[in-house]
Amino acid sequence: MRNKRIVIIGTRTWELTSIHMEYFVKNNANIVGILESPTEGITTTTSGGSSSKPINEVAEELNIPIICGKPKGEGVMDQVRAWKPDIVVVIGYQFFLPDEFLNIAPMGVVNFHTSLLPRHCGRHPGFWTIWYGDEQSGMCVHFMDSGLDTGEIAYKSYVPVENGDTVDTLYDRIWKNDEPIIKQLLDDIESDSVPRTPQDKSEYTYNYVPHESDFEFDFRQRAQLLVNRHLVKPNKSYIVLNGTQYPVAACTAIDEPTTSRNFKLNTPYNHKGNLVYMTPNQWLQVDELIVNDQPSAAFAIAQKELGEIATI
């Protein structure tokens, strides 16, 4: 067991918490207490299903004291102080930590954020990484300050973002690569030498909770990006035909069907009996739409809504 005293903050229903908690235990972290998030109102873009144990079960097995609450909840900060942590580690917690909380441990508070800060600060970073077509992602361990994911960076890991990724597959690739970071963090905690590099605030981008309107296909984006957006939340993306919103069940990026680009944006065309739209790179073929909760041929639906569709 290592010497430095660590308090872990996390959420029992989040894989981010359970997977990384397993790494901390495996690498002999001296965990003296756990603050667990209340689960009411917690949102996620992952599907769950981790084989790692939730933090409440780990706490019970290892006889680690655990409390559940928000940072300003009655007695929460007093209990964290009573554990006398050298450092606090956050691995999945949606509640803002006030300055009084950040100052409890002499070495401060570090947070595990699943994006390459300062890009994609805030919520659901994996979702937005895929949404914006980033080619690379990873884990960032940073010190927490009064801003939102704006504190000094300690470590980063890097993985590629692949076509066809979902939030689950991207996070799985990142998190499987995180044990070396945790071992390095624990080693540096022991020697009081956790590195601190200021973020470039000019590169800061903030995420928000996805809105229904975000899922309408924007044909100003390249076709493969639209396919990836569809895959990140299947059956949520949609097109509008004659004022009616149709969820997309299947779509494909296809090579240019013609040498001409004399076509209108946001306009459906008929290509060999398929419904297609021009994008800045390739064309998007919409194969199936959802009607009455069932996938149906997109071109037939478009014909019914629009009548004759121009052929390319």
PLM feature segments, named:
Residues 1-235, 271-273, 281-285, 290-312:
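One-carbon transfer enzymes
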Residues 237-243:
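Short conserved beta-strand and strand-loop elements enriched in small hydrophobics
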Residues 244-248, 284:
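Short, isolated positions in well-ordered beta-strands
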Residues 249-256, 288-294:
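A short, sequence-level motif marking secondary-structure junctions
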Residues 254-287:
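Low-complexity, glycine/alanine/valine/leucine- and proline-rich hydrophobic stretches
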